[in-house]
Amino acid sequence: MSDQSFDAPVWHNGKALRKGYTTGSCATAAAKVAALMVLRQHLIHQVSIVTPSGVTLCLNVESPHIEGRQAIAAIRKDGGDDVDATHGMLIFARVTLNDSGEITLQGGEGVGTVTRKGIGLPVGSAAINRTPRHTIESVVREAIGPARGADIEIFAPEGEERAQKTYNARLGILGGISIIGTTGIVTPMSEESWKRSLSLELEIKRAAGLERVVLVPGNHGERFVREQMGIDTQVVVTMSNFVGYMIEEAVRLGYRHIVLIGHPGKLIKIAAGIFHTHSHIADARMETLVAHLALLGAPLELLTRVSDCDTTEAAMEHIEAYGFQHIYNHLAQRICMRVMQMLRFTKTPPTCDAIMFSFDNQILGSNRPIEEIVEEMQC
């Protein structure tokens, strides 16, 4: 990525969105300027780094301080127009020179601690991902030369509070934020970043020994599983709209049993072979309902009424009025069939089940008896 491409906006829904930079870039820049300040013994107010994607960032330095062989500096996180929980916070680095020739890196206040396997970092270590670790150590080594040593501490005073608005606790990262970023650049509305964060939860649960997983579109699905089905939320992972991607990730990681649970408004699309359920990709909810109602012998009047509906909930009212609620079991079976078709080239595909529920938390249908599915998920 060139500097010009960094300055160029990302267009989304007709709006120009500004790119930003990651906590990893902030920590790298803060560590570099702290190392330079302790060597030169004077304050520096601007620093440049080259991100892993090749973009050069020129960043303002805040709170610079030198005390003997130690210096502290901070960089303010700017997520561009992809405002997240860490946007606007200060990421600090403290660099202390020594004569060991070695560089050490640790997390301080506000940087989370890894408590579970599965994210590529040792349990007990600071949540500073591999790419930022490399860039932080590299810029400090370049600054101090081959003979000197340095102890680096990355800290973020607001980190513990900000982390409560992130997925960190679910990923087993406690006490603060993560220092992350494989490219160093934040791209607004980045689907790949979102998908990767969801997949990471699958990896952590698999590393903990989980072989069965419930995939839900969002918070409503998770609540339903916990409150109405009595299934431990430890087996629940959000898939958002990325149904196909998350199923493939679960297969890659070796899960043996996948259960899809959600409202028909999302899951119906899977019955039509649509594995990315965002409306900007595809809809076909009413068409799918009409087709399967017709297969079940529904009268033309019901088909017409459903076809004219704008929402799944409205269609469901007509389906209930005509006594065709058994369509949900039929659709759940169709969903599982579609999943197995998608995985037809997989050597050992997992078992797949599907359950649909209404907005008022009533179970509408499933591909096989609910009791069997729940019992297996509790094993």
From Swiss-Prot:
Q: Name one GO molecular function term.
A: cobalt-precorrin-5B C1-methyltransferase activity
- The signal peptide here is none
* EC numbers on record: 2.1.1.195
The keyword Glycoprotein is annotated on this UniProt entry: no
- Give, as in the UniProt entry, the pathway in which the protein acts: Cofactor biosynthesis; adenosylcobalamin biosynthesis; cob(II)yrinate a,c-diamide from sirohydrochlorin (anaerobic route): step 6/10
Enzyme class per UniProt:
transferase
Q: Name one GO biological process term.
A: methylation
Q: Which reaction does it catalyse?
A: Co-precorrin-5B + S-adenosyl-L-methionine = Co-precorrin-6A + S-adenosyl-L-homocysteine
Keywords in UniProt for this one?
Cobalamin biosynthesis, Methyltransferase, S-adenosyl-L-methionine, Transferase
Family assignment? Answer: Belongs to the CbiD family.
Enumerate the PANTHER family for this protein: COBALT-PRECORRIN-5B C(1)-METHYLTRANSFERASE
Q: Under what name is this protein listed?
A: Cobalt-precorrin-5B C(1)-methyltransferase
Species of the source: Citrobacter koseri (strain ATCC BAA-895 / CDC 4225-83 / SGSC4696)
